[in-house]
């Protein structure tokens, strides 16, 4: 999505504008390293995120470099992973402080980043994984990638379905890629002392906020 915006001459964060080389993700072999680079070295096969990556050579901050697993993963596959993988690992593990056995809900789970979140939650041993999408034709895909329950976030009863799934407690953690109309409902669907990690604005960046629900 961001690459299409930049290709059309728009901006994404600090990148963009007419003449900008497109690309946020890439993979390849390291040919040079700075003096203070840690954990990777010349010759390593890596996947990275950055800007202007659709080029023969690209520069990456070593903190955004991930070694490609020592298996048969090819560069094409690896180049599709860095942004989604880093974004969702940060949201679920670093900020969300997810613990094995907890319940998790991913709003906007049918997006590329959301699909990665389902897989991370599955690998980390979530007790129950709930994913949302407004497109019912994508429900089977979400289930195939780890969702135990799939809901439509525009269904007025989705919060009740979450509560029914979690013994009326709500989930331990919500990763919200939507914002907008989901903000107040998210608070209703979260367990007391649970966490909501806001990642995206696919449903809008401005909305009414119910302070009573937050209290």
Task: Please tell me what each predicted stretch does.
Residues 157-169:
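Short amphipathic alpha-helix with an adjacent loop that forms part of the alpha/beta core around
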Residues 3-52:
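Glycine-rich beta-strand-centered segment in the early N-terminal region that forms part
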Residues 53-56, 133-143, 205-211:
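Short, glycine/polar-rich helix-capping loops at beta-to-alpha or helix-loop-helix junctions
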Residues 142, 181-215:
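Glycine-rich phosphate-binding loop and adjacent beta-alpha segment
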Residues 50-63:
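A structural motif shared across PLP-dependent enzymes of the aminotransferase-like
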Residues 78-156, 187:
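Mid-domain Rossmann-like dinucleotide-binding core that forms the NAD(H)/NADP(H) cofactor-binding site
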Residues 108-109, 178, 201:
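NAD(P)H cofactor-binding loop motif with strongest signal on the N-terminal glycine-rich segment
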């Amino acid at each position: 999505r961001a690459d299409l915006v930049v290709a059309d001459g728009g901006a994404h964060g600090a990148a963009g504008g007419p003449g900008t080389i497109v690309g946020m993700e890439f993979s390849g072999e390291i040919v040079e390293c700075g003096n203070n680079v840690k954990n990777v070295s010349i010759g390593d096969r890596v996947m990275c995120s950055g800007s202007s990556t659709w080029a023969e050579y690209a520069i990456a901050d070593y903190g955004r470099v991930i070694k490609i697993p020592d298996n048969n993963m090819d560069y094409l596959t690896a180049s599709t992973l860095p942004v989604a993988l880093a974004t969702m690992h940060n949201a679920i593990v670093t900020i969300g402080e997810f613990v094995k056995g907890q319940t998790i809900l991913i709003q906007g789970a049918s997006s590329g980043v959301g699909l990665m979140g389902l897989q991370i939650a599955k690998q980390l041993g979530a007790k129950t994984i709930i994913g949302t999408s407004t497109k019912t034709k994508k429900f089977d895909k979400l289930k195939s990638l780890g969702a135990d329950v799939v809901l439509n976030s525009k269904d007025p009863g989705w919060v009740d379905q979450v509560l029914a799934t979690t013994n009326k407690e709500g989930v331990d953690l919500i990763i919200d890629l939507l914002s907008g109309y989901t903000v107040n409902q998210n608070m209703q669907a979260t367990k007391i002392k649970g966490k909501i990690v806001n990642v995206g604005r696919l449903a809008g960046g401005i909305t009414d906020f119910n302070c009573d629900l937050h209290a």
